[in-house]
Amino acid sequence: MREVISVHVGQAGVQIGNACWELYCLEHGIGPDGFPTENSEVHKNNSYLNDGFGTFFSETGQGKFVPRSIYVDLEPNVIDQVRTGPYKDLFHPEQMVTGKEDASNNYARGHYTVGKEMIDSVLERIRRMADNCSGLQGFLVFHSFGGGTGSGLGALLLERLNMEYGKKSNLQFSVYPAPQVSTSVVEPYNSVLTTHATLDNSDCTFMVDNEACYDICRRNLDIERPTYENLNRLIAQVVSSITASLRFAGSLNVDLNEFQTNLVPYPRIHFPLVTYSPIVSAAKAFHESNSVQEITNQCFEPYNQMVKCDPRTGRYMATCLLYRGDVIPRDVQAAVTSIKSRRTIQFVDWCPTGFKIGICYEPPQHVPGSGIAKVNRAVCMLSNTTSIAEAWSRLDHKFDLMYSKRAFVHWYVGEGMEEGEFSEAREDLAALERDYEEVGQDSMDNEMYEADEEY
């Protein structure tokens, strides 16, 4: 069995976790109490081991299924909602780790003071869970860049996981600060510091920003004032599509290592852009054909992206198309050929093929009350493109505005952090921007050279 352990850190991580496990349970026919429902695959197969979902659930002697996940937060409020909510019986009490005081939106508190006191007990729970795995494949870490716990404790956890489980895959799902919408003033500080700290400890980071998700909910789902629950259920559909090939059988399955192999050309350039299609409300669903060609085309439209940036200005290095539901390889081939023939979608010249395809035959599951209509096929596109550097430069600019006046820095230094870490982190992000520039530049230079030769 190739097990995967999910770790949900801080408020964003925990709330996305709730939406993900709610969806996984629906997909696999597991009730909120952890026991299989009547139409569950367990009854069809007589054994969960025949099926891929043992990668995400472990089975107890009583026939109950327990998620392979850990919830971590420095304050108890958000996790208490899970402890008393509809899925309270799904999780083992030991899977919930809470502290007594929060990180106050301060990376240094999450990383150096409050978080440091808690990290060993978190790792002990992870160790116990890893011991129950026969062939641990890796970790999925869910957190936000902007909060204190998500950024500080998230970075510390990834550091320690890398030390103790260096050979295992480490994938992050991170809520990135939105361009206009902000949840705290010091978001740029926390984000730059956590990116610097995790750059060498994460194999692949899938980013989503709240503003892009708000826009998708408003435009595609006709939800006038989207709540975090709407956003999280949308993100859960994306996470489910990425992990579907680990949990279900399919003709072209993709495992954790394959994501890195196909999407990350250089170790530091590991931030794929995520796009999902179709996202339609129930009212619109009957009027759209959602053919393979159509949903593939929608993935290349900026308005379906989970991070605000313009892919038409950059170049694609690698693209992973993960289809699920009623999809046949021939249709996918036709869709990809038509995409390649477009002049607007440009690939770097050192990666001419550029497409990795995954097909999982399990259709997307509809969550009641999510606003997303039930569809018979969907696609999630993960693309490593140079245009995501736009997001980094936006973040760096906000950081510079505050740091030039040393605003709020004393709160971080007061928690035992060196002021030099700010400039070190900022330099690292400047280097990251340059890395993206160079990768795109190589192609530009070659093109100019070829044009000169033709002339």
From Swiss-Prot:
Keyword set, alphabetical order: Cytoplasm, Cytoskeleton, GTP-binding, Hydrolase, Magnesium, Metal-binding, Microtubule, Nucleotide-binding
CDD domains recorded: alpha_tubulin (cd02186)
An example Gene Ontology biological process: microtubule cytoskeleton organization
PANTHER family per the UniProt record, alphabetical: TUBULIN
Native source species: Schizosaccharomyces pombe (strain 972 / ATCC 24843) (Fission yeast)
Site (Involved in polymerization): Y455
Protein name according to UniProt: Tubulin alpha-1 chain
Gene name as annotated: nda2
Role played: Tubulin is the major constituent of microtubules, a cylinder consisting of laterally associated linear protofilaments composed of alpha- and beta-tubulin heterodimers. Microtubules grow by the addition of GTP-tubulin dimers to the microtubule end, where a stabilizing cap forms. Below the cap, tubulin dimers are in GDP-bound state, owing to GTPase activity of alpha-tubulin.
Compartments (UniProt record): Cytoplasm, Cytoskeleton
PROSITE patterns in alphabetical order: TUBULIN (PS00227)
Binding site for Mg(2+): E75
